């Protein structure tokens, strides 16, 4: 009943599975009234007397994958997950690379938007190079917000290749030991799992590898 009355959702595909993702809320005034009846108090950060440190933004611009516009126009592209280029079948006596093929089919407005976002982040080699450069630029603790599990796995591989301790907070995994005890750790946080709550103030640098569907998760993540 709560979801039906107060939650706005849309169906999205994550790692090959379809699920409902929260995109916003409705009947908010009614929800606040109901919660207030049970003792809830609503305050802004300023009203609560919380002073957040000044934020300094460093924009690192990267181009989308070269395959982005081809997909956007054709609504289809086959990605080679090994090199993030366009897939070309390579088979010989010893085997083939067919297992590396990822077909992106934008046959609906939702799938078209989803895969377009992935081509800007998950399947964009330039993003990973920019991430590597950022990690090499500091030995401080880093928080990295991401969307898709495959993004995290690729980023984690880069971090471990640079001998950086890794922590993960996602819907499937919670391991924050490196974050707590290693000054040069990198903590990967899935938006849905950690953007709305959690205290990560041991770190003072955040990397947004890719942006979420809606602005609310991004805005809340800045207060972690």
Can you say where each PLM-predicted feature lies in the sequence?
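Inter-lobe coupling linker of SF2 helicases/translocases
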Residues: 1-140
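Short, solvent-exposed loop/turn segments at secondary-structure junctions
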Residues: 7-9, 40, 67-69, 121, ...
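Short His-Asn-centered micro-motif
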Residues: 25, 32, 54, 145-147, ...
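Residue-level preference for the first positions of well-ordered beta-strands
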Residues: 59, 141-143, 185-188
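Conserved strand-helix element at the start of the C-terminal RecA-like helicase core
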Residues: 138-156
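A generic "structured core" feature
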Residues: 142-144, 158, 178-179, 219
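Conserved RecA-like P-loop NTPase helicase motor core
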Residues: 152, 165-224
């Amino acid at each position: 009943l709560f979801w039906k009355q107060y939650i706005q959702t849309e169906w999205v595909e994550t790692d090959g599975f379809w699920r409902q993702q929260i995109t916003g809320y409705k009947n908010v005034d009614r929800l606040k009234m109901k919660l207030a009846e049970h003792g809830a108090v609503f305050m802004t950060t300023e009203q609560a007397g919380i002073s957040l440190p000044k934020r300094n933004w460093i924009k690192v611009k990267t181009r989308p994958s070269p395959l982005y516009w081809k997909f956007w126009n054709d609504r289809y592209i086959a990605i080679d997950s090994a090199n993030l280029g366009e897939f070309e079948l390579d088979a010989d006596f010893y085997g083939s690379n067919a297992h590396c093929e990822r077909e992106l089919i934008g046959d609906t407005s939702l799938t078209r938007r989803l895969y377009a976002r992935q081509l800007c982040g998950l399947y964009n080699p330039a993003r990973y190079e920019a991430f590597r450069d950022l990690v090499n630029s500091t030995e401080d603790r880093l928080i990295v917000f991401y969307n898709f599990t495959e993004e995290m796995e690729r980023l984690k591989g880069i971090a471990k290749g640079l001998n950086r301790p890794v922590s993960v907070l996602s819907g499937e995994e919670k391991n924050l030991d490196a974050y707590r005890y290693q000054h040069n750790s990198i903590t990967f946080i899935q938006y849905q799992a950690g953007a709305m709550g959690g205290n990560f103030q041991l770190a003072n640098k955040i990397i947004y590898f890719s942006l979420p569907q809606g602005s609310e998760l991004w805005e809340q993540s800045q207060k972690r």
